[in-house]
């Protein structure tokens, strides 16, 4: 196949990785606060994954301090959790992300960023389990996740997992957020005479 416009050109127009990461408004030094952040990022990554109609078999959690902080120790690490079955269930992805966090968390650092990345995708959740595997897919998982996404469709964060917390202090600062002129009526500029 050639890239000169003929219809046999092969493209990869499907998702290969899904990442949700943020820099924190306040540095995190507490593992519970980091756990809340990782749950929120895993939840959002799973939502994106379902939007692409994909299933994942790998969850990576990473944390890092600021490489530019003077007189502070620098630390960055990531851990990968392989899933026994492909999933798009937020519960499975959150659990894997939190297990990975336990591997990379180190006390004594002021973390400035964390994230969750999903990879090793398959377009369906069908997998051949081993003959003696005890792990089976969750019943009604797709229905539950579809309902969750429908409830959250009219606005992010209407329904969330408890591990995410209710009012995290570490959230991104949004004072300098650009106005959303094309998507939010309240941000439209008003002309006055």
Where are the model-predicted features located?
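DNA-contacting surface of Y-family translesion DNA polymerases
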Residues: 1-108
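Acidic, metal-coordinating catalytic segment for phosphate/diphosphate chemistry
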Residues: 75, 83-193
């Amino acid at each position: 196949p050639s890239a000169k416009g003929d219809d046999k050109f092969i493209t990869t127009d499907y998702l290969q990785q899904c990442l949700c990461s943020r820099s924190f408004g306040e540095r995190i030094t507490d593992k519970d606060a980091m756990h809340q952040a990782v749950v929120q990022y895993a939840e959002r990554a799973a939502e994106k994954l379902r939007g692409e109609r994909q299933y994942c078999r790998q969850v990576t959690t990473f944390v890092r301090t600021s490489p530019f902080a003077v007189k502070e120790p620098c630390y960055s690490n990531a851990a990968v959790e392989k899933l026994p079955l492909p999933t798009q269930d937020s519960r499975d992805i959150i659990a894997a992300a939190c297990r990975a966090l336990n591997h990379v968390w180190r006390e004594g650092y002021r973390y400035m960023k964390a994230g969750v990345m999903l990879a090793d995708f398959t377009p369906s959740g069908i997998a051949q389990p081993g003959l003696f595997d005890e792990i089976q897919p969750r019943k009604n998982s797709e229905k539950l996740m579809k309902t969750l996404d429908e409830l959250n469709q009219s606005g992010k964060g209407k329904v969330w997992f408890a591990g995410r917390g209710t009012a995290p202090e570490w959230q991104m600062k949004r004072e300098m957020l650009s106005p959303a002129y094309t998507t939010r009526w309240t941000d439209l500029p008003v002309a006055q005479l």
